[in-house]
UniProtKB/Swiss-Prot annotation:
Residues 1-60, 113-125, 183-227, 277-486 are cytoplasmic. Residues 394-411 have a biased composition (Low complexity). One of its GO terms (cellular component) is trans-Golgi network membrane. Keywords: Golgi apparatus, Ion transport, Membrane, Transmembrane, Transmembrane helix, Transport, Zinc, Zinc transport. GO terms for biological process: zinc ion import into Golgi lumen; zinc ion transport. Belongs to the cation diffusion facilitator (CDF) transporter (TC 2.A.4) family. SLC30A subfamily. Heterodimer with SLC30A5; form a functional zinc ion transmembrane transporter. This is Zinc transporter 6. Its main location: Golgi.
């Protein structure tokens, strides 16, 4: 699309070049004959890939990724030649290593990116999504192995052991080399934070029993073992037993049994990690952090000037990073910046992305009476007598008229105070009851000396209201028309 320029000639014959933009605005600037083309998705991916490869740490990850693809291709060909389902299940662990390398590369990209307007908390959730996707895909592969193994139990084919043992050692060597050479922070954190799998628990029980006989092995066996290393060793052990039984007794069904065992161990190892990463994606609060957060919130509520801590919400935005928002209500005379600094100092040690809303107390309590109110309501005749004896309340200037909620004068232009109830009667005309007694409006002040009517000591003039239930007479605002007063 060509952008047109409008040439305007002023009175001084000075040319002014203006470029018409998309928003229909004319601005001064350089003429661009063609609009800048938008990049495609592949172009954006290529740009981000060049950004990652600019760091030398990614070269090692890319090298292991290429070796993984070559090794996985060789293992899949050997699985086809040997017709071994157990070796196929073990090859899926190599494919999982490829997913872990991609996750590691994505983690490096996240550290290089800065938060944007769309992703204000950063791109850490991409790591969580990568871990969740990898573990779920491996579990789906395990279910596929279980389905194929059930079909093989009906009709067991012959298994060739020519490259079975070679493929086992090649896969074990490459898997351990990848796990121990490349530091994968997301999977390391998940393996430590997630709950232990049933395979880890059984191995821990065997390790305790063995360490009771040989105490020297306690430093090696008693600590919590890496679940990825454990599943690789257990799978290689199952393949070794399968090779021996097929070679010695030609027991081909052992291959299917080993495939089922490897699939179950893989599913049991990946399931706790997928659950943990799924909870992070759901923005939940980790269970091991709830107690610490409660303790910190109690400390914040005891700070000087803090009246209330409410609407607290904390969630995980990534592995090891916690975000939160809290509302703090403080006194009117408290220093907002000082309270904010103290709250931030207490919570920032645990919550990396913290939002604190500090607002001052705006509650105002209406004081409608300065004396002691009567225990029983007054009758209508008592109101009439009081209105006849005492004169009306002296009028105040408009600028100094008290409000129902506060005792301070309010300006004519100021709005009514917050939480003040718009009680009727302040600007109402005097009300006359159609009875034989003299009447005065209900808002008359009690200023007469010596008479209190059960309202306590005489106080300043203010509005006093009582509720009249089922009054026998109607009342209007006008001239008295009843019988003559006595």
């Amino acid at each position: 699309m060509v952008a047109l320029d409008v040439l305007g000639i002023t009175d001084s014959d000075a040319p002014v070049y203006r470029q018409k933009q998309e928003a229909d605005t004319l601005v001064l600037g350089t003429i661009h004959p063609f609009r800048k083309a938008h990049r495609s998705v592949l172009g954006k991916l290529a740009q981000e890939f060049r950004l990652v490869t600019s760091d030398r740490r990614s070269w090692k990850i890319l090298l292991f990724g290429v070796l993984n693809v070559v090794c996985t291709g060789c293992l899949l060909m050997w699985c086809s030649s040997t017709n071994s389902m157990a070796l196929t299940a073990y090859t899926y662990l190599t494919i999982f290593d490829l997913f872990s390398l991609i996750t590691c590369l994505l983690s490096l990209w996240v550290t290089m990116k800065k938060p944007s307007q769309i992703y204000s908390f950063g791109f850490q959730r991409f790591e969580v999504l990568a871990v969740f996707s990898s573990t779920v895909l491996v579990q789906l592969g395990s279910l596929f192995i279980l389905k194929e193994s059930v079909e093989r139990f009906v009709e067991q084919p012959e298994v060739h052991t020519g490259r079975l043992l070679v493929g086992t050692f090649v896969a074990l060597f490459f898997n351990l080399l990848t796990l121990l050479s490349v530091k994968n922070k997301p999977f390391v954190f998940v393996s430590e934070a997630a709950s232990t799998s049933w395979l880890q628990e059984h191995v821990a029980d065997l390790s305790r029993s063995l360490c009771g006989l040989i105490p020297a092995l306690s430093s090696f066996l008693l600590p919590r073992m890496n679940p990825f290393v454990l599943i690789n060793l257990a799978g290689a052990f199952a393949l070794g037993i399968t090779y021996m039984l097929i070679e010695i007794n030609n027991y081909n069904a052992m291959d299917t049994a080993s495939a089922v065992a490897i699939a179950l161990m893989t599913f049991g190892t990946m399931y706790p990690m997928s659950v943990y990463s799924g909870k992070v994606l759901l923005q939940t609060t980790p269970s091991h952090v709830i107690g610490q957060l409660d303790k910190l919130l109690r400390e914040v509520s005891t700070l000087d000037g803090v009246l209330e801590v409410r609407n607290e919400h904390f969630w995980t935005i990534g592995f090891g990073s916690l975000a939160g928002s809290v509302h703090v209500r403080i006194r009117r005379d408290a220093d907002e910046q000082m309270v904010l600094a103290h709250v931030w100092n207490r919570l920032s040690a645990l919550v990396s992305a913290l939002t604190v809303h500090v607002f001052k107390d705006e509650w105002s309590r209406a004081s409608l009476s300065s004396g002691v109110l009567p225990s029983a309501p007054l009758s209508l005749s008592e109101y009439v007598t009081a209105a006849a004896v005492f004169p009306a309340a002296p009028s105040r200037a408009q600028g100094s008229e008290p409000t129902p909620a506060t005792s301070t004068p309010a300006k004519p232009s100021s709005p009514p105070p917050e939480f003040s109830f718009h009680t009727p009667g302040r600007h109402v005309q005097p009300v006359v009851f159609q009875t034989a007694h003299p009447h005065r409006p209900l808002y008359g002040g009690l200023q007469g000396p010596g008479v209190r009517l059960g309202l306590g000591p005489r106080g300043p003039t203010l509005q006093a209201y009582r509720t009249l239930s089922a009054a026998p007479h109607t009342y209007t605002s006008g001239t008295y028309t009843g019988p003559p007063r006595p």
